[in-house]
A protein has these predicted regions:
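N-terminal auxiliary segments of SAM/dcSAM-dependent transferases
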Residues: 2-87
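Short, solvent-exposed loop/helix junctions and linker helices
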Residues: 9, 60-64, 101-105, 224-228, ...
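A general structural signal for well-ordered alpha-helical segments in protein cores
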Residues: 16, 36-37, 67, 77-80, ...
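Generic alpha-helical structural context detector
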Residues: 37-41, 69-72, 112, 138, ...
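SAM-dependent Rossmann-like transferase core, predominantly class I methyltransferases
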Residues: 55-57, 65-144, 149-164, 287
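S-adenosylmethionine
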Residues: 146-148, 152-290
Length: 290
C-alpha cells in the first residue's frame, strides 16, 4: 500500500498530520509521530527543530519512497534505530545495525559511575566486555581522555560496527579486540571491568517484544541459561585481572536479578558491593571492589 499516492506533493506538515489522523493505517497504540519525525530527520538529514521550522518543505518522490519503505519496515516491528541506523547514547549518535544491541538509556548509568570511580586515578585502564556498538567503551574513552580503554567482542561484525563509531569520533585511546576475553585476556592490571552482559533468562527471552526478539542479536540478550552465567565468569576474571582496589561495574536486570548478582560477588569475596538505581528508580547497576 502506497500511503502517499503517485501524484500529490507532500509537505512535512501534511505527512505529520496524516499520521495523527490515520488510525486505520497507524496503530493508535504505537507512537508513530515520534517514529515519523525520526524518519524524516534521517531522510532529510536535519534536526527535529528543523522539521518544525520548515513545516512547508515538500518531499520529492525519492524521499517519499524512502519514507514509505521505512514505514513498512516499522510496521513489521523492526526497531527505528535499525531502520535509520542510528541510536543516541550519552548525548552522542552511534551507528547501529542488526549485528549489535541497541543502546538503552539505563546503560548510561554505567558511564556516570565509572567516571566517579576513576576521578582520582591517573590514566586508568578500563576493559569493556562485549562492546557491541562500542557505545560504552567509546563514551568512556571520550569522557575520560587520559584512560586506556580496551574492549572486546567475539563477533567480528560487532567489532566492525564499534570501529566505525570509534573512527567517527576520532578516538585514539581505545583498542578493540575480536577475541573471547574469558579465554585470553593478556592485561593483568585493570582498574575497571565494565559490561552490559547478556542477563535475560532463556525462558524470559521468548516473552520479549517482537521488535526485540525478532531483530536484536540473541547473544547480546540472553546467556541461554539462568541469566547469571556471565556474572560468575566476570567475577572470576576480576579476581585474576583487576588491580587491588579495582572495580567491576555491570548492568543488571530487574526484579530479583540484582540481588542474585550481588550474591555471586559476595561468594567471590568482593568488597564494597553496591546496587545503583537508574533514572527510573530501578536497581540496574552493580559495583564490586576487588
Amino acid at each position: 500500500m502506497n500511503l502517499f499516492g503517485q501524484t500529490k506533493k507532500w509537505s512535512i506538515n501534511q505527512i505529520i498530520n496524516l499520521v495523527n489522523n490515520n488510525s486505520f493505517f497507524f496503530d493508535e497504540n504505537e507512537n508513530w509521530k515520534i517514529d515519523i519525525e525520526l524518519f524524516l530527520c534521517s531522510i532529510l538529514k536535519c534536526k527535529k527543530t528543523d522539521l518544525y521550522l520548515n513545516f512547508e518543505r515538500v518531499l520529492n518522490k525519492l524521499q517519499l519512497s524512502e519514507l514509505m519503505h521505512y514505514i513498512d519496515r516499522r510496521k513489521s516491528n523492526e526497531p527505528v534505530q535499525y531502520i535509520i541506523q542510528s541510536s543516541n547514547f550519552y548525548g552522542r549518535k552511534f551507528f547501529v545495525d542488526q549485528n549489535v544491541f541497541i543502546p538503552r538509556p539505563e546503560t548510561e548509568r554505567l558511564i556516570d559511575i565509572t567516571k566517579e570511580k576513576t576521578k582520582n586515578l591517573k590514566s586508568p585502564i578500563i576493559f569493556d566486555i562485549g562492546t557491541g556498538s562500542g557505545c560504552i567503551s567509546i563514551t568512556l574513552a571520550i569522557e575520560i581522555p587520559d584512560a586506556q580503554v580496551l574492549a572486546n567482542d567475539i563477533s567480528k561484525d560487532a567489532i566492525d560496527v564499534a570501529r566505525k563509531n570509534m573512527n567517527t569520533y576520532f578516538v585514539k585511546n581505545l583498542q578493540l579486540i575480536n577475541e573471547d576475553v574469558f579465554l585470553n585476556l593478556g592485561c593483568n592490571s585493570l582498574d575497571i571491568l565494565i559490561s552490559n552482559p547478556p542477563y535475560i533468562k532463556l525462558d524470559e527471552y521468548f516473552l520479549l517484544m517482537p521488535d526485540v526478539i525478532n531483530f536484536e542479536p540473541k547473544a547480546a540478550l540472553t546467556d541461554r541459561s539462568n541469566g547469571l552465567s556471565f556474572y560468575k565468569r566476570i567475577a572470576e576474571l576480576g579476581n585474576l585481572k583487576l588491580n587491588k582496589g579495582g572495580w567491576i561495574i555491570l548492568e543488571v536486570g530487574k526484579g530479583k536479578h540484582p540481588l542474585e548478582v550481588r550474591e555471586i560477588f559476595n561468594n567471590y569475596d568482593y568488597d564494597n558491593i553496591e546496587l545503583f538505581k537508574d533514572y527510573n528508580g530501578d536497581y540496574r547497576v552493580i559495583v564490586a571492589q576487588n
